[in-house]
Each structure stands twice: as structure tokens, then as C-alpha cells.
């Protein structure tokens, strides 16, 4: 036919059988990719340390999505939370991957069948004998079925009535597990961090979809609306479908980047705003303060801080620190975390407790500045030693560790003190293994960052696609050059005001 590459889809424009075929093939490709990617990730995933080497540090992309829907066991005998299991059942990670691949194969065969047997009676208008689709009726059918699926997910899967529930955790990502969720019907259901909203919104949206589907199945659109919105044109379906997809992509880009109940930090890693706001640091200090109030000493209070909580409070886990085009997992960047060294507390020779000013998200380098509790600068690592007033050597800074591997150890050697001050800029200090994966020391983003970038980019692209195809279908007659008034509108001198038919010049 000699069509250019960007026009090849016109071959299914008036061919309902093959239009169905290519959509089934698309589903086969999507399901096949998901299943294959899951098997690849399972082949490279190391489940041995869910605290310091969780799935998001290893760059897993599809495993977190399976996990948040209730899959936690593997046929390899491990559980995502670290325990051993004996009977994982059919719906393990491998089982879900296999189901996607089998489904992909069936869709592949169905696509071939519909490509070969494209001229089916069901696609023909019995009055004209030509291929025709009743698009408003098809819209009603799809809306009804989508509503049933949406309602079923919210009412059965999420609530645990017939299903596992979803991943639910505390605000600091420490106690996450799969559990059933009761719908939240009050105003709290609109809080994006309340899991109950997932159940209630799916039930409500599903109910609305079922009712709307029945409406569109039983009520025909008015003729003027049908013609005005070009409801008989398949490109109208394309345009409105693209609109639904780009809107959803923008929404999930937001819920992923800013965080929500559907994107738990245990599965996707922390958000950048938790570093910016010192979210985990505040909770750590609150716990230490509570311990001191119970007459614990500093060592005891810091030793009770969960390693998982301390690890969140490390800039290397900030998804905004990795460049968008730095390929690889976080472990390929700063290395595999081995252990928490403990919390360093710096003091000058006068006994002031000093705090290292932390590096903001978008800095690659940052001056090492130590301030006291009032925010007054007491020490630093100067750029020019000749002009220094607050150097570690001059001020006599020492460091002592509480909790972690270096618990109870103190250093007064300026070189060592400066080393730990630099590392304290990046949050809690961890021992990182860079040898195993030949990690290069350059921070990487987490799957949270990749998902957001990908969905925001495609949403923008699809937004333009919606405008393009919407304009094509609405102004099809104009673009085709069959508008009877088109020549008159653009003819120079036909109107006093170009294109305004009310100002037509009178012929004398």
C-alpha cells in the first residue's frame, strides 16, 4: 500500500475485525512483558536482607506492584518480609508471572485468529451489509464491565472478603504487611495516605461505572450530540481513550512521587520530600527523646532505633539524588548497605553538642558546617585553611557513636572526625559494600523516580495525542477539504472580516 510509517494504523480504520485483532495482540505484548520482566527480576532478586537491601534498592520494578496487591511468597521458599515458607501456593511471584505469560500466549493466538477471520457477521450492519460498529453500545458494555471489575476489586480483594487484601504499613514504613482493609466512608477516605480510601473509592467508582454502563446501554445519544461529538467515528474513541490514559498517567505520577497509601515506602523507597523535611530524622529524635525521658542513657536510647528507620534517613535512598539517565539500581550506585555504624554525636572542647548541617537534595557537594543547638556555627571544614577560624583542629571537635556497629567508640583525631562529619551530611552513616557489584559511588534513583519520570513523560505525549486525534475527528470534513463553505471563508475579499460569514461583501 506504500503507507508511511506514521500512517500504517489506517489499515484498521474501517476494519472492525482486525482492529480487535491488533488490540488483542497489544494485550499479549503487555502481559508477556509483565510476566517475562517478573521472571527476570526474580532471577536477579536477593531476598536475604529485606531491611538493608530491599526490593527498591535492587531496582525491582514489577515485584513491588505484585507485592502491594497481596503476593508475598516465592516458589523458591522465601517470603518478601524475610521469613521462610513451606507452602507458597499457586499465587506466588512465579505463579503470577506464569499466569501472565500463559495469558499472553492465548491472546497471541486469539489475535492471529481475528486477523485471519476478520470478516465476521457480528461486525456488519444488517441494513447495509457493510462493516459497522455501534460505538455508543460498545462504550456502555466496556463501562459496565470495567465497573464490575472495579467494584469487585474494592469490595472483595481489598477488603479481604474474597482475596488477600493489600499492603498496609505505618507512616514510617516499619511494620508493612498484607492485610484486609475496611472501606473508609468518612472524610478520612479522601486522605491519600489512608488505605481504607482504596476500598471505598473502588466500590463507589465501580458502582458509578455499572450504573453509567447500564445507562449507555439503554439510552441512545441525541442525534445532535451524536453528530457534534462524531460518535460514529472510531477516531473519536481513540481520542477519548487517550484522554483517559493520560489523565490516569498524570494521577499515578503524582501519587508515586509525592507518596500515598498505594505507593508504600517499603516497596518503592522513600520520597524526596521525606528527606527535605527531615521526616525520619524527627521520628528518630522523638524516639531517642522518649527513651531518655524513661531514664535510659544515650547508648540505650540509640540502640533501640530500628536499623530500618535509620536506613530511610540516608540521602542515598532519596529518589531525587539519582540522575534520570544513570542506568542501574541504587545498589549499583553507592553500593549494598551492610550495616548501620551508629549515630555520631559531635562535641567541641567546650562540651557543646554539634549537629552537621545536612546536604539539600539538589546539591552534589556541600560545605561541612557544624552548628550548636541554637543554630550558631561552631565548627567547619574550611575551603582555605589559612583563613579558617572554626576548623575541626582549632575548635577541638570529637565524635562519639551511639547504637550501631561503632556503639561506644569515640574519635578525637581530626582526620577521622572530618571523615565522619562529611558522611553525616548524608544522614545516618552506613557501611556500604561497593565491591560486589562494582558500584561506582554515584547515586541512582529508585523505581519511584523511574515510574514518575516515565508516566509523566508519556502523559504529556498522550495529552498531545488526545489533542491531535480529537482535532482530526472534530474537523475531519475541514481537513478532508469537503466543507462547502471553506473556499468562501478563506477567499480574499469575500468577507469584510476574514472568515466571518456575517460580513459578506455585497456584489453590486
UniProtKB/Swiss-Prot annotation:
Subcellular location: Plastid, Chloroplast thylakoid membrane
Main location group: plastid
Membrane topology label: Multi-pass membrane protein
TM stretches of this protein: 21-36, 101-115, 140-156, 203-218, 237-252, 457-472
GO biological process, one term: photosynthetic electron transport in photosystem II
Cofactor note: Binds multiple chlorophylls. PSII binds additional chlorophylls, carotenoids and specific lipids.
GO cellular component: chloroplast thylakoid membrane; photosystem II
Pfam families membership: PSII
SUPFAM superfamilies from the UniProt entry: Photosystem II antenna protein-like
GO molecular function: chlorophyll binding; electron transporter, transferring electrons within the cyclic electron transport pathway of photosynthesis activity
Self-association state and partner proteins as the record states: PSII is composed of 1 copy each of membrane proteins PsbA, PsbB, PsbC, PsbD, PsbE, PsbF, PsbH, PsbI, PsbJ, PsbK, PsbL, PsbM, PsbT, PsbX, PsbY, PsbZ, Psb30/Ycf12, at least 3 peripheral proteins of the oxygen-evolving complex and a large number of cofactors. It forms dimeric complexes.
Similarity-based family: Belongs to the PsbB/PsbC family. PsbB subfamily.
Name the UniProt record assigns to this protein: Photosystem II CP47 reaction center protein
Organism encoding this protein: Phaseolus vulgaris (Kidney bean)
Lineage: Eukaryota, Viridiplantae, Streptophyta, Embryophyta, Tracheophyta
Gene that specifies this protein: psbB
Amino acid at each position: 500500500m506504500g503507507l508511511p510509517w506514521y500512517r500504517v494504523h489506517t489499515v484498521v480504520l474501517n476494519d472492525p475485525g482486525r482492529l480487535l485483532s491488533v488490540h488483542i495482540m497489544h494485550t499479549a505484548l503487555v502481559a508477556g512483558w509483565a510476566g517475562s520482566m517478573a521472571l527476570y527480576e526474580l532471577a536477579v532478586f536477593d531476598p536475604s536482607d529485606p531491611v538493608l537491601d530491599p526490593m527498591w534498592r535492587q531496582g525491582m520494578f514489577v515485584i513491588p506492584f505484585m507485592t502491594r496487591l497481596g503476593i508475598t511468597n516465592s516458589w523458591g521458599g522465601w517470603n518478601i518480609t524475610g521469613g521462610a515458607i513451606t507452602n507458597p501456593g499457586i499465587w506466588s511471584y512465579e505463579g503470577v508471572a506464569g499466569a501472565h505469560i500463559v495469558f499472553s500466549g492465548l491472546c497471541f493466538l486469539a489475535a492471529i485468529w481475528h486477523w485471519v477471520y476478520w470478516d465476521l457477521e457480528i461486525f456488519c450492519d444488517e441494513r447495509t451489509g457493510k462493516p459497522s460498529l455501534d460505538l455508543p453500545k460498545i462504550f456502555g458494555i466496556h463501562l459496565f464491565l470495567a465497573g464490575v471489575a472495579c467494584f469487585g476489586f474494592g469490595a472483595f480483594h481489598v477488603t479481604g472478603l474474597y482475596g488477600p487484601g493489600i499492603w498496609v504499613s505505618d507512616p514510617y514504613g516499619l511494620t508493612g504487611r498484607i492485610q484486609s482493609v475496611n472501606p473508609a466512608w468518612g472524610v478520612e477516605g479522601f486522605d491519600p495516605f489512608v488505605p481504607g480510601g482504596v476500598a471505598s473509592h473502588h466500590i463507589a467508582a465501580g458502582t458509578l461505572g455499572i450504573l453509567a454502563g447500564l445507562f449507555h446501554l439503554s439510552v441512545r445519544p441525541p442525534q445532535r450530540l451524536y453528530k457534534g461529538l462524531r460518535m460514529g467515528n472510531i477516531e473519536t474513541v481513540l481520542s477519548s481513550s487517550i484522554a483517559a490514559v493520560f489523565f490516569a498517567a498524570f494521577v499515578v505520577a503524582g501519587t508515586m512521587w509525592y507518596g500515598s497509601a498505594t505507593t508504600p515506602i517499603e516497596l518503592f523507597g522513600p520520597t524526596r520530600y521525606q528527606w527535605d523535611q527531615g521526616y525520619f530524622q524527627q521520628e528518630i529524635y522523638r524516639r531517642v527523646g522518649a527513651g531518655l525521658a524513661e531514664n535510659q542513657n544515650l547508648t540505650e536510647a540509640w540502640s533501640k532505633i530500628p536499623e530500618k528507620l535509620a536506613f530511610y534517613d540516608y540521602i542515598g535512598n532519596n529518589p531525587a539524588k539519582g540522575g534520570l539517565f544513570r542506568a542501574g539500581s541504587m545498589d549499583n550506585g553507592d553500593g549494598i548497605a551492610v550495616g548501620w555504624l551508629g549515630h555520631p554525636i559531635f562535641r567541641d572542647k567546650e562540651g557543646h553538642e554539634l549537629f552537621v548541617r545536612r546536604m539539600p537534595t539538589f546539591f552534589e557537594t556541600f560545605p561541612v558546617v557544624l552548628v550548636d543547638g541554637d543554630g550558631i556555627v561552631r565548627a567547619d571544614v574550611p575551603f582555605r585553611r589559612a583563613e579558617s577560624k572554626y576548623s575541626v583542629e582549632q575548635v577541638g571537635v570529637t565524635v562519639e557513636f551511639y547504637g550501631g556497629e561503632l556503639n561506644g567508640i569515640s574519635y578525637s583525631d581530626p582526620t577521622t572526625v572530618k571523615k565522619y562529619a562529611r558522611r553525616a551530611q548524608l544522614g545516618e552513616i552506613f557501611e556500604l559494600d561497593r565491591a560486589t557489584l562494582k558500584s561506582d559511588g554515584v547515586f541512582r534513583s529508585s523505581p519511584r523516580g523511574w515510574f514518575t519520570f516515565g508516566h509523566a513523560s508519556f502523559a504529556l505525549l498522550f495529552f498531545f495525542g488526545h489533542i491531535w486525534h480529537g482535532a482530526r475527528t472534530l474537523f475531519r470534513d475541514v481537513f478532508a477539504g469537503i466543507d462547502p463553505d471553506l473556499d468562501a471563508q478563506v477567499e480574499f475579499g469575500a468577507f469584510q472580516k476574514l472568515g466571518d460569514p456575517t460580513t459578506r461583501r455585497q456584489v453590486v
